[in-house]
C-alpha cells in the first residue's frame, strides 16, 4: 500500500475505536474512499456537528445538545421517583435497550480507582442533589462487579445515607468482574429483579 499521509492518519484514528484493529480500519477507509459523496461528506459534516454541539451534562453525566439542553435531566418529559446510577453512557444505553428500567439515569463518568480516578472526579455530589431535588424514592446502583465498581457503589451508598431514598444494588445475576455494557438482557433482568437493599446494612 502506498504511503498517503492522509490515508495513513485516517487508518490510525479509526483503528483506535473499540473493536477495530488496523485491518478493519483499512477496510473501513477503503469503503469510505469508494463512497466519497454518499459516506465521506455526510460523515464529515455529522462529526463536525457532534464536535461543536454535543457535550456531557455536568449535572447528570448524560450526553446533551448545546442547542436543546439535556433531555435526561433538564428537559425530561417524564417524572420518575427512581434513578439508576451507571458508570458510563454505554451502560445506560445497554439498560435502556433491555427495557428493564423506567426512570432517570445518572452517569458517574467512571469509577473510583487506585490509578488516579478520584471520587471528586465523579458526579456523586450532583447525584445527592438530584435525589433531594427530585424526591427520589429509590437509587439503583448499577456499577460493574469489579473492585472499582463495588468500591464506588459503597461510597455512593455512604454519600446518600442522609437522604430518604432507598439504595439498592444489582444482585447476584451480575457475574464477578462483569461490566454492564457487555451483559445480555437476561442477565441484566435477573440482576435488576433480585437487587439487594443496602439500607438494611447501614448503621
Predicted regions and their residues:
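Cys/His-rich Zn2+-binding cysteine-cluster or related metal-binding knuckle/ribbon modules and their
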Residues: 2-7, 16, 26-84, 88-92
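Conserved, well-folded catalytic cores of nucleic-acid-processing
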Residues: 13, 17, 35, 50, ...
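Conserved phosphate/pyrophosphate-binding and hydrolysis machinery centered on Walker-type P-loop NTPases
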Residues: 18, 37, 50, 63, ...
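Long C-terminal interaction/binding lobes of large macromolecular proteins
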Residues: 24, 128-203
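Extended interfacial segments that mediate partner engagement and assembly in macromolecular machines
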Residues: 25, 75-143
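Core recognition of P-loop NTPase motor domains used across DNA-transaction enzymes
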Residues: 39, 44-47, 58, 71-72, ...
Amino acid at each position: 500500500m502506498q504511503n498517503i499521509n492522509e490515508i495513513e492518519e485516517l487508518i490510525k484514528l479509526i483503528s483506535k475505536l473499540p473493536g477495530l484493529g488496523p485491518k478493519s480500519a483499512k477496510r473501513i477507509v477503503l469503503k469510505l474512499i469508494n463512497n466519497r459523496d454518499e459516506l465521506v461528506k455526510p460523515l464529515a459534516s455529522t462529526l463536525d456537528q457532534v464536535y461543536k454541539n454535543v457535550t456531557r451534562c455536568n449535572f447528570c453525566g448524560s450526553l446533551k445538545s448545546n442547542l436543546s439542553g439535556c433531555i435526561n435531566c433538564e428537559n425530561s418529559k417524564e417524572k420518575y421517583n427512581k434513578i439508576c446510577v451507571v458508570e458510563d453512557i454505554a451502560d445506560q444505553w445497554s439498560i435502556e435497550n433491555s427495557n428493564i428500567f423506567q426512570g432517570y439515569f445518572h452517569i458517574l463518568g467512571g469509577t473510583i480507582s487506585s490509578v488516579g480516578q478520584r471520587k471528586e472526579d465523579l458526579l456523586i455530589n450532583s447525584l445527592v442533589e438530584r435525589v433531594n431535588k427530585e424526591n427520589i424514592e429509590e437509587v439503583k446502583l448499577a456499577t460493574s462487579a469489579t473492585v472499582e465498581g463495588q468500591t464506588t457503589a459503597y461510597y455512593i451508598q455512604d454519600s446518600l445515607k442522609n437522604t430518604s431514598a432507598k439504595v439498592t444494588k444489582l444482585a447476584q445475576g451480575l457475574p464477578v468482574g462483569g461490566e454492564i455494557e457487555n451483559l445480555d438482557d437476561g442477565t441484566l433482568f435477573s440482576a435488576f429483579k433480585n437487587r439487594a437493599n443496602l439500607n438494611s446494612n447501614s448503621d
